[in-house]
Amino acid sequence: MNLHDHPDFDAHESVTCINDQRAGLKAIIAVHNTHLGPALGGCRYFPYGNTAQAMTDVLRLSRGMSYKNALARLPFGGGKSVIIGDPRRDKRDVQFEALGEAVHALNGQYVVAEDSGTTPEDMRIVARKTPFVSGVEDSASGGDPSPSTALGVFKGIKAALAHHCGSESLAGKTVAIQGVGKVGFALARLIRNEGGTVFASDLYAPSLDKAIAELGVIPRTHDDILSQPCDVLAPCAMGGVISATTIPTLNTRIIAGAANNQLGTASDGEALRQRGILYCPDFVVNAGGVIEIQHQRLGSDALTRSKALEIIPANLMQIFATADGEHIDTERAAVALAHRILGKPRSNPATQCAA
């Protein structure tokens, strides 16, 4: 398939495919939009079944980053990178050095950060080869943004509860979290600390065991968690879990989670609206991490960083009001708002796929 014919290609400015046999690196870097500034987005390390799956993911993720950064009012465009492999088995320092070289070759068009499957330490290795990296341990650029991602989702959940249920209180509420890795675990802790009950699942047994032992979450299987009766469903693992297949089985009033690309297709937002389920668009509610990264770069103090996260519930309330007033789904309302902030895209995007 020609890249321009890919269903998820959306006038991306550049797509770079990397196949470095010396380093054992198979990766893709996608830059969606740099209208507001250099494309900032994390590097996901995941065992995709094939390159086509990786391409679909990176195209969708990079577009989501354009929306996320725009709605967070950050001076960045949207980009993403993915590495094909198992991060628990295949990681090598030389891979991240090679990734750094590829990022550097883009001359500042893309700024890489950590994401699912990568760490601040991995980004430190990338930084050996390029300054276009954020989230680096023991440097002015900071470290792990996942606690801020979790806090942003938490604030989003409270906003959704206030809008949909009349009170933002989590006391006595039930939340089902799919995925209790770094972000999901931190979110579960915040909810438990406010008196909420947490059901949780994770395909990686040690992560679920830790959440059970330390937080008292109630375990569920990774599939059953989606149909668990609850006030809030929080997808915090991989995307695509809210789809035509799963929507009829959902037993929740609100969806608000940290996972990217939660909807299988754009039409799933309308299907949720028809069922009376309030969906918090993922690129709105999970923006805490990228907001944190920016304030790490600026050297902001803790109070400033915390206040910056208030844009998440503020955005959601605006989106909810638009969706209610125009009788449209919240995903559509959020995308429209992002497009207004992004403004007119560049007129001469240069798309490439270089091996």
Give the predicted meaning of each segment.
Residues D144-V232:
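Glycine-rich phosphate/diphosphate-binding loop of Rossmann-like nucleotide-binding domains
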Residues N69-L74, Q109-E114, C165-T174, H222, ...:
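Flexible, glycine/charged-enriched surface loops at secondary-structure junctions
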Residues M1-S141:
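N-terminal ligand-binding/catalytic initiation module
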